[in-house]
Amino acid sequence: MAAAKDTHEDHDTSTENADESNHDPQFEPIVSLPEQEIKTLEEDEEELFKMRAKLFRFASENDLPEWKERGTGDVKLLKHKEKGTIRLLMRRDKTLKICANHYITPMMELKPNAGSDRAWVWNTHADFADECPKQELLAIRFLNAENAQKFKTKFEECRKEIEEKEKKGSGKNDSTEKVVEKLEALSVQEGEQPQDAAPAAVEEEQ
């Protein structure tokens, strides 16, 4: 009897295991949402530089101003394919939240951080990390001095490229203004009569 009972229990156990292995629950969502493509605006830009770093901002609004860590992630230099503008973009790891987002301008200057050969400090008048433009004093630190130098080299290349672009743009504007001035002067001269023309006409009529 004991052997028969054990055999029966083994059969029940194997049956339960078989049922569990065959059981494949599928949960259908209550509401099916269509997949949406999320654009980051990076689709229209060319990646010129990418490197891992840590970003800081100077919290001057605090009672005791100090450097605050903004996040660690990949810092990128991105050039717009049509407009030619170049911006610095950095997102935090995992969350991908933006911690730096501003255009490179000719006036920007990377300055070495005191006591470190792998960190730079610079000012930006309009950083859009918090969506609203805000003036910030930022600092970025790399793994080593070599990486920091690579960033500076590319940053300077971008800054000079934007500077040249703006010079060409201002030159075109100056040329356009000169052409307009000449056309205006020409139209005025055509509309004016010589001073001796009027008396001559009067004499002929007499």
Swiss-Prot record:
Keywords: Acetylation, GTPase activation, Phosphoprotein. Residues 1-33, 162-206 are annotated as: Disordered. The modification N6-acetyllysine is found at K150, K182. The modification Phosphothreonine is found at T13. One of its GO terms (molecular function) is GTPase activator activity. One of its GO terms (biological process) is nucleocytoplasmic transport. SUPFAM superfamilies: PH domain-like. Pfam families: Ran_BP1 (PF00638). InterPro entries: PH-like_dom_sf, Ran_bind_dom, RanBP1-like, RanBP1_RanBD. One of its GO terms (cellular component) is nuclear pore. The modification N-acetylalanine is found at A2. Residues 26-164 form the RanBD1 domain. The modification Phosphoserine is found at S21, S60, S187. The modification N6-succinyllysine is found at K150. Plays a role in RAN-dependent nucleocytoplasmic transport. Alleviates the TNPO1-dependent inhibition of RAN GTPase activity and mediates the dissociation of RAN from proteins involved in transport into the nucleus. Induces a conformation change in the complex formed by XPO1 and RAN that triggers the release of the nuclear export signal of cargo proteins. Promotes the disassembly of the complex formed by RAN and importin beta. Promotes dissociation of RAN from a complex with KPNA2 and CSE1L. Required for normal mitotic spindle assembly and normal progress through mitosis via its effect on RAN. Belongs to the RANBP1 family. Interacts with RAN (via C-terminus of GTP-bound form) but not with GDP-bound RAN. Identified in a complex composed of RAN, RANGAP1 and RANBP1. Identified in a complex that contains TNPO1, RAN and RANBP1. Identified in a complex that contains CSE1L, KPNA2, RAN and RANBP1. Identified in a complex with nucleotide-free RAN and RCC1. This is Ran-specific GTPase-activating protein. It comes from Bos taurus (Bovine). The gene is RANBP1.
